[in-house]
């Protein structure tokens, strides 16, 4: 199953120049095992194999590249670690409101109602503090690794 996800990504990337000839897509070379080890040590989590397979194909994109995800930069493993560290620092310093004040979208019962969790791993960035994240801390109704849209200045989290 994980290889299928990586293959689908490759096929989608191959279509971009045909569908958007003006887009300049600059993808990074695939990640190494050392890249995975460094990130996993930093975030205290083991990445699932399907995510690793995707990052073995492309380790995110250049900051100068056209966005692969609508309006957001696809982060390399190193940039994931950097972004996660910023959020973890804010979390550790108590900058987030009481967890009970966080909320997810009404249709996103699968997401814990938190302002932020150290187990939300950002893999995109829009330049304004908003991310798509892998959610490794879902509610009982959610799935580990589900993708959530995190807004830095709003308690609304979308699945």
Walk through the language-model features, giving the residues of each:
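A surface-exposed partner-binding patch
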Residues: 1-127
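Short, intrinsically disordered, charge-balanced linker/junction segments flanking boundaries
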Residues: 153-159
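Low-complexity, glycine/alanine/valine/leucine- and proline-rich hydrophobic stretches
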Residues: 129-153
